[in-house]
């Protein structure tokens, strides 16, 4: 909501008026290991559908799309492509790492070590409680972080805004600047299809290779 308010303020300060629409997002990490993962792509498509429905049922001149995680970022990209309006994506940033660069990615390894008796239950509990120390997308180059980079590489985010730490104060200013910039894009009539071209896809593919991005992307 902080970023929504900042984006709205940027729109207001540039002479526009925005409207807020929300949709829910599931966590692929929590959904793994049981039937919940079968909802992953379905919920991505539902988010994209709702973006299309809200966008086309109302006379918007542009859109700021806020998402951070595995399927919500691609859902926004799919939705804004269908709308083909002036569009900017901003993200909620990336989670801080835990002690000794501990991340959620390592919990599976520690779980196996606990089952083999190589670490104590106490140590395993410590890892679980400290792997996700803040809000934000998972702090490793998984699908969420990769998709943030891909959105910027495609030209749909402000330069330098992908992978900013979720606890970084600059993120608020980035959201505000996105609100101001969407007004400029709307005045120019610069649509998503004017930015996302074959060349921008080729650029994103090269960037993906350069960062060793998630193959899920």
Language model segments and positions:
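Flexible, glycine-rich loop/tail regions that form catalytic "lids" or insertion modules at the edges
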Residues: 205-207
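Active-site-proximal helix/loop microenvironment
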Residues: 212
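Active-site cavity-forming subdomains of large catalytic enzyme subunits
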Residues: 40-203
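Anionic-ligand anchoring segments at beta-strand to alpha-helix junctions in alpha/beta enzyme folds, i.e.
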Residues: 2-42
């Amino acid at each position: 909501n902080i970023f929504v308010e900042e984006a709205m303020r940027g729109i207001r300060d540039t002479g526009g008026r925005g409207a807020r629409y929300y949709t829910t997002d599931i966590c692929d990490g929590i959904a793994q290991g049981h039937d919940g993962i079968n909802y992953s792509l379905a919920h991505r498509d539902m988010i994209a559908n709702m973006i299309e429905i809200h966008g086309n049922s109302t006379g918007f001149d542009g859109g700021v799309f806020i998402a951070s995680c595995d399927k919500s970022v691609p859902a926004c990209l799919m939705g804004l492509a269908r709308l083909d309006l002036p569009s900017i994506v901003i993200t909620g940033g990336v989670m801080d790492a835990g002690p000794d660069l501990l991340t959620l990615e390592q919990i599976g390894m520690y779980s196996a070590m606990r089952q083999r008796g190589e670490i104590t239950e106490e140590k395993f509990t410590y890892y679980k409680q400290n792997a996700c120390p803040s809000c934000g997308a998972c702090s490793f180059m998984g699908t969420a972080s990769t998709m943030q980079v891909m959105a910027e590489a495609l030209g749909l985010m402000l330069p330098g805004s992908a992978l900013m730490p979720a606890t970084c104060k600059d993120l608020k200013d980035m959201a505000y600047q996105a609100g101001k910039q969407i007004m400029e894009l709307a005045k120019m009539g610069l649509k998503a299809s004017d930015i996302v071209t074959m060349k921008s896809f080729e650029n994103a593919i090269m960037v993906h290779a350069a960062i060793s991005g998630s193959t899920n992307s």
